[in-house]
Every structure is written in structure tokens, then in C-alpha cells.
A protein has these predicted regions:
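Active-site/ligand-binding neighborhood in enzyme catalytic cores
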Residues: 202-331, 341, 366, 371
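Conserved beta-strand-loop-beta-strand element in the redox core of flavoprotein oxidoreductases
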Residues: 329-352
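Conserved flavin/dinucleotide-binding core of flavoenzymes
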Residues: 2-43, 342, 393, 400-401, ...
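Glycine-rich FAD pyrophosphate-binding loop
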Residues: 73-98, 102
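Flavin (primarily FAD) binding-site architecture
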Residues: 357-381
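Mobile amphipathic helical/loop "lid" adjacent to a hydrophobic cofactor/ligand pocket
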Residues: 3-15, 25, 31, 116, ...
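N-terminal Rossmann-like FAD-binding beta1-loop-alpha1 element of flavoenzymes
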Residues: 51-81
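Core beta-strand elements of the Rossmann-like FAD/NAD(P) dinucleotide-binding domain
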Residues: 54, 348-357
Length: 591
């Protein structure tokens, strides 16, 4: 657990050089500047005239699918999006249907509504490709109220029945400082964290690769907990220190749910500062994928000015008649390779369409559960990687409250009556969202992973809220949380949804090779024809699962792959990820 400067101080610079430049998600496995590629005025590439207007199936309307579809439309292709539920995927903002305190009967916009972020809710500013699309749509962000941040105001840590109130790390007992110092020192001694981050700041790809490749070879088969338990910085400390580290974590809360994961997975998060400087999207992050669906392109070589993904999905002869009524195709039931080499996509309704290229952005397990997929579309080694992907469970339960009552000061203690809360009780993490004066507030009563999430799985939203409130009442005796709740609770367990089967990937020790196979699948030049034309994207295909940046970067990989598949090319002055992959691609470990 560490304290961090405000997100404003970490805003992304336009140039990358010197220690003043920010840390971004530049690698470390594949140090390619996706943000620079997508922002370049030359564009992502050029298609041959005969390819313009050709259809590409995009399975999944989450952020990976929508980014890819939007960029493919800009290039001049016709994306056909298939979505089983609703646009957004795990960027799902559930709105509480509540009037504002000064409701005059007029409809209110998203900024005045209480929102429960059921999926992605905190977005590190190091995610510069993801933020490119936020900026494109003019969406606002604010610092996320993580523990011990200015945005949270105050934090309560409740462990083993003992409770501490803090506004900074200095307010906590020495035990917590010792844990934070041990973690930071272990990262620096074992991995040279500052050197890795300096290479990222300066975008020195060769230095970064030389450092990171050695780490991959040495640490792929080591778990997060093995690192913590064996590090000499923790060896002189008690088991209690490791226990506190698991319960409280560093930056964003407890990490014991990740103790079984590969240390490489955790190190990537730390090296790229995904664990710090996080922001929320005002009004809900679902505005981003929905906004891309409705955003007009004005620079496409094929589509008239004003064309949107929505208008391409409406039965109108002129796609320039931009419409917000366009809807994606439905859920996909099967994928088949046809005799002519095209790929047939069958919907659950029975409708069949064939395509020269298909992009699957769904969770990889769906290719063997919900979708009857020709085995010949992927190599057996890739099937092994797709099936061995391990998804983590996640549960959240939210309630809307009449106002941000937790900011009130207890006259007896001089402290806020309630705080962002980390605990070993079943709530684990409780987050408080202040929507401003005279506006309803939102409480994420509980955000938990893995076994803690499974405790909630069988129960209704009402029962989950009741269990969480009971736990919080033990931490805040005398505080009447219930009296402030308005409306019904909102909850999610991603593992119970057949179109997700889990919240996000958590790679286990020894999974690097699997990740490498999935991530590099967009490089299809050496593949047999039977495996070409189907592409993969999504955060679980990336090296940074659970972060939207990974979804965006793999979507851009797929865009390059599809561009190349149709005979297109990038601009010489703006090479794409596939152009640099032979030189900078992830290190290959022996099989």
C-alpha cells in the first residue's frame, strides 16, 4: 500500500523524453506506442480500392470490439457488430432511475444521475490509448476515490476486529509503513523498477526489452505470493505483515485474491502504473463504447461524411443518414470455415452471413461454450492457450443514497462519519462516490474477487446488500446507513453470466507462453490458409488483463491484422504494431 500524487500531476505529456515524461502502458512485453500510432495525422493505413466496403464481422460490442469497428470503418471497411446483450461489454454503467434533489420534471442528463459501474470503474492515466478515445468523445474524468487518496478524503482499515482511521499513510501504525516500504524496496532490488520505468518514460524500447526479457525468463513460473514470501525485505518481517499486505495491498486495495497469479502479471501492473493515478468517467464509462457506436466519421475513403456504426447497421440505402436507432446483430451461435475460404457466422436466430475476416472480442472461453467453433480455425497450440485462460470471479453491489452523508463530521471524533473502507470482512472494499451537492450519492457496498466474490454468488441483490450493510455496521456502530438508501440495490457477478463466465483473466505461473500465443495471433503471415482471417482482441488477449488499455491495444493489433489481410498497408512514416512486431515483439520462451 502506497500513497500517490494526484492524477492531475500525472497528466500525459505530448512528447516522451527525460524523466519528466509520464509512465504509460508502453509494453513492457511489446513496447510499441499505440497512442502515437492512433493519433498520427497520416492515419492507420490505406486499403486497396477493391477492398473498400468489404464486410468484417466483429463479435462483441465491448470496448475492444467498438474501437476496432470504429477504426475499420474509418479505413473504409464495413464492420458488422454482433452483440449478445448490450453495447459496452464489461464497461457497463447501470443507472439508478432517480430524480435530482431539484427535479423540475425535466429529464436529467447522465451527469446528474447516480451510476453504478458494474465492470471497469477506475482507469489509470497511464492508459494513453484508452484516454485518446475518451478525449475524442469529450468525456470528463475525475480522480477515483481509492484508499488514502485526496479523492477519498479519508480511509478506514478494519482488520481482525481492529479499526484505524487515516487520511494519509502517516496516520496509520508503523506496521503499514513497514509493509509499504518492504514492497517498494523488494521491487527495486529484484526488478530494478526505477530503471524499467525510466525506459518507459523515454520510450527506449531496446533498453526496456533487454531488461524485461530477462525478467520474463526468470519469473514466469513464480507466483505473486512466492515473491512476497521469499523476498528478503519481507523475510525479516512477521507473517502479520504479509497478511496485512494481502488485505490492504498497495494503492488500490487488498491483493490477496491475486496471490496465486503469476508475478509477471502483477509486475506489469506496477511497472506501467496501472495501480495508481486512476480516474473515473463522469456520467459512466459506458458512454465511451456507446459514443463510438454513434460517432460520425468524416475522413473515410469509402463512407460519406456523417456515417456512423449505428447508421451502417440500419436498413437504409444511404449510410450517411446517421441514426441512433441502428442495432447490432444478435448473439453468435457458430463459426464455420466455408469451402471458398470465407467464414460463416451463424446467429442464434439462425441467420447466416459469411465474411472474409472475423474479429472475436468475446471472452475466449465462449469459443468453446456459447459458440460452436470449427476447431480448424485455430491451431491446437492456440486452442490450448484459449482454454487454459483462467478467469477470475468478481462481485459488486451498489446502492444509491439521498446525499453524500459520509462527508458529515462526527462532532465527538472530528472525523468523517464514514470513509472508503478496506476490511477482511466480506465487503472487502467499500467505495463512496460523491456526485456533488444536492445530488444522490452512490456507495459500492462491496467489491470483491475470487473466493470473496463466490460468497455472494447465490444471493439476490437485496440479500447481498443486507449482508454488506451488516458487515459495515460492525465497523461503524451507530451509523444508520439504511436510512439514506433510496431505490433498489444493483449487483453483478460476472461469472454467472454465460456471455462472460468471469470478470477478467488472471494468468497463473507458467502461462506466459499461452499469453504470447494469443497476443501474437494477429501476425498471420506464416499461418496456413485454414487459420487466417479470424482475429482475436480483448483485455484477456493482452498482457494487461482487467485494464481497458489492454482491450484497446489488442483491438488496434487486430485492426492492423485485418488491414493487412485485405491487402492494405500502413503509412511509411506511421508504422503499425505488426510492422514493428518482428523487432520488438514479446520474447519467445522455449516450449
Amino acid at each position: 500500500m502506497t500513497t500517490f500524487p494526484s492524477a492531475e500531476s500525472a497528466s500525459c505529456a505530448d512528447s516522451f523524453g527525460g524523466s519528466a515524461a509520464p509512465v504509460t502502458v508502453f509494453g513492457p512485453d511489446f513496447p510499441f506506442g499505440y497512442d502515437a500510432w492512433v493519433k498520427a495525422p497520416t492515419g492507420l493505413g490505406v486499403l486497396p480500392a477493391e477492398a473498400l466496403g468489404r464486410e468484417v464481422a466483429v463479435i462483441g460490442g465491448g470496448i475492444a470490439g467498438l474501437v476496432a469497428a470504429y477504426e475499420l470503418m474509418r479505413l473504409g471497411l464495413r464492420p458488422v457488430v454482433y452483440e449478445a446483450e448490450r453495447l459496452g461489454g464489461r464497461l457497463r454503467s447501470e443507472r439508478f432511475p432517480l430524480p435530482t434533489a431539484h427535479d423540475d420534471g425535466a429529464s436529467s442528463d447522465g451527469s446528474s444521475e447516480a451510476v453504478a459501474e458494474l465492470g471497469g470503474m477506475r482507469f489509470p492515466v497511464s492508459s494513453t490509448s484508452f484516454y485518446h478515445y475518451l478525449e475524442l468523445l469529450g468525456l470528463r474524468t475525475e480522480p477515483f476515490p481509492n484508499p488514502l487518496t485526496e479523492a477519498a478524503g479519508s480511509t478506514v482499515i478494519d482488520l481482525g476486529g481492529e479499526t484505524w482511521y487515516a487520511e494519509t499513510l502517516a496516520d496509520l501504525p508503523d506496521l503499514f509503513k513497514e509493509v509499504a516500504e518492504a514492497w517498494d524496496a523488494a521491487l527495486e532490488r529484484e526488478f530494478g523498477l526505477s530503471g524499467l520505468q525510466e525506459a518507459i518514460r523515454t520510450r527506449d524500447a531496446q533498453t526496456l526489452k533487454s531488461l524485461w526479457n530477462k525478467i520474463v525468463a526468470a519469473w514466469d513460473e513464480t507466483s505473486f505470493y512466492e515473491f512476497v514470501s521469499r523476498a528478503e525485505e519481507f523475510a525479516d518481517l512477521s507473517f502479520r505483515h504479509r497478511e496485512v499486505f494481502g488485505q490492504v495491498g498497495f494503492g488500490t486495495g487488498g491483493w490477496d485474491s491475486d496471490f496465486a497469479n503469476s508475478m509477471l502479471e502483477i509486475l506489469r501492473v506496477v511497472v506501467t502504473e496501472c495501480d495508481s493515478h486512476q480516474e473515473l468517467v463522469v456520467g459512466g464509462v459506458e458512454q465511451l463504447p456507446v459514443g463510438l457506436w454513434n460517432r460520425a466519421v468524416n475522413d473515410s475513403p469509402r463512407w460519406p461524411k456523417g456515417t456512423t456504426l449505428a447508421s451502417l447497421h440500419t436498413p437504409r440505402p444511404d449510410p450517411s443518414e446517421a441514426s441512433r436507432t441502428g442495432t447490432p446483430r444478435g448473439a453468435v451461435a457458430s463459426l464455420r470455415r466455408l469451402a471458398d475460404g470465407r467464414i460463416a457466422v451463424t446467429e442464434t436466430s439462425g441467420e447466416v452471413c459469411s465474411y472474409d475476416a472475423v474479429l472475436a472480442t468475446c471472452q475466449s472461453w465462449l469459443l468453446t461454450t456459447e459458440i460452436d467453433c470449427d476447431e480448424s480455425l485455430f491451431s491446437q497450440s492456440l486452442w490450448m492457450a484459449l482454454d487454459r485462460t483462467r478467469y477470475m470471479q468478481s462481485s459488486k453491489t451498489f446502492v444509491a443514497v439521498d446525499h453524500s452523508f459520509w462527508k458529515e463530521i462526527d462532532p465527538h471524533t472530528g472525523r468523517q462519519v464514514m470513509s472508503m473502507t478496506l476490511t477482511d470482512r466480506l465487503t472487502r472494499g467499500t467505495y463512496l462516490f460523491d456526485n456533488g451537492p444536492d445530488q444522490p450519492g452512490v456507495i459500492c457496498l462491496t467489491y470483491s474477487w475470487m473466493s470473496d466474490a463466490l460468497k455472494m454468488l447465490p444471493y439476490s441483490a437485496e440479500k447481498r446488500a443486507e449482508l454488506a450493510i451488516r458487515a459495515l455496521e460492525k465497523i461503524y456502530p451507530g451509523l444508520d446507513i439504511r436510512s439514506h438508501i433510496i431505490g433498489e440495490p444493483v449487483t453483478v457477478s460476472w461469472e454467472s453470466n454465460p456471455y462472460f463466465l468471469g470478470a477478467f483473466k488472471g494468468a497463473l505461473p507458467g502461462h506466459y507462453r499461452y499469453n504470447h500465443r494469443m497476443y501474437g495471433h494477429f501476425m498471420q503471415e506464416d499461418m496456413p490458409d485454414s487459420e487466417r482471417g479470424i482475429f482475436l482482441a480483448g483485455d484477456s488477449i493482452s498482457f494487461t488483463p482487467a485494464w481497458a488499455e489492454g482491450a484497446v491495444q489488442t483491438a488496434l493489433n487486430a485492426v492492423w491484422g485485418i488491414l493487412t489481410h485485405f491487402g492494405g498497408r500502413t503509412h511509411p512514416e506511421n508504422p503499425g504494431p505488426g510492422d514493428r512486431y518482428p523487432e520488438l515483439g514479446p520474447v519467445e520462451l522455449p516450449e
